[in-house]
């Protein structure tokens, strides 16, 4: 049996907002067709809710919701996002709430103000009117057949400022018929201890209403405070794939989900597809036209890469000595990086990885290691150069000729003043040694 046995206990719902909050991140953008493909991929993975955008905020989101009506999703529910009614209008008169209905999604998520600073200084209305705005908006959407998730914006800041009023805003949403009350750390400034304490108090205050958390990464704690919220009784977690989002990003679902399943023993609908989470991460980056994070926990190429000789040696003997989970559980793999820090174990593991079997007692291995370290000292790098490593290994241990022989090379650098640019040209001449092909 695997040493990483998973025992499920409590069910947690995953709410993905990559297509809405994620697109507010710098350099993140999806086409309408791209958003549809992302929604399908998220559904295949098994998330519970997919927040598709804000109807009326831009033509792209409007087009997405039109196209989304044609989707045949197996697991997830599409959610439209918007705000409570304006202070000067009734819910049925508010054009933004009408657009939320026109999106024709089974779920609508609306946010309202919790922090009195925002109520009086941003909305410029009264505390009492804000409570009515929340209740009226939720009830209007509920009466029109929508499941409503209420996002309590700036909840933690508002609670610290005035706990009684913060709870009153949630009570207003509950009276309106919200199926979930999600507490938002909108500024991303709260610590784990604060979120733990506040979520526990809210859960105790609303024992029969599901509580969610929506956190940001401004303090580098987006994942930690999200897990803290779940630990304190929340049953829904919001976030984005790869943590994309405004400023420093949203809580990263590609880190949260494995932790919930593998470390906290929570039951998630997507647990059966956990080994696809790295593929999902790469897919989202590709669709958003952004570079992947090499060091991302669980899903990054470096997540299970061993460079130090001691680490590689220990991992070769006992896999979990330097790996906190089996990489395959999240669709990743163990990698060995060869450098001047490498020892015999590192070289042997790397050689095996590229299809070369080595004898640990081989007298050439010691000389090869010395040569490798000398080359690294002189500035050569083999960490990301598997082909160069293999060529050196073949020459050193097997007495083979290189697969090619450098005959000559020429490098020219010049400046074309008319075009105001520097032009470089490099030409090499090689002789290839090809394997003999025998007739069948």
List the predicted regions and their residue ranges:
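Alpha-helix-loop-beta-strand connector modules within alpha/beta enzyme cores
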Residues: 62-83, 132-143, 198-211
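A mid-to-C-terminal "edge-of-domain" accessory segment
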Residues: 11-12, 18, 264-429
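Conserved small/polar residues in nucleotide/adenosyl-binding loops
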Residues: 430-436
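Active-site mouth loops of central-metabolism enzymes
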Residues: 18-33, 82-90, 121-127, 154-163, ...
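Glycine-rich, proline-tolerant flexible connector loops at the mouths of alpha/beta enzymes
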Residues: 48-72, 81-85, 113-124, 154-158, ...
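Alpha/beta enzyme core
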Residues: 32-45, 92-110, 114-120, 128, ...
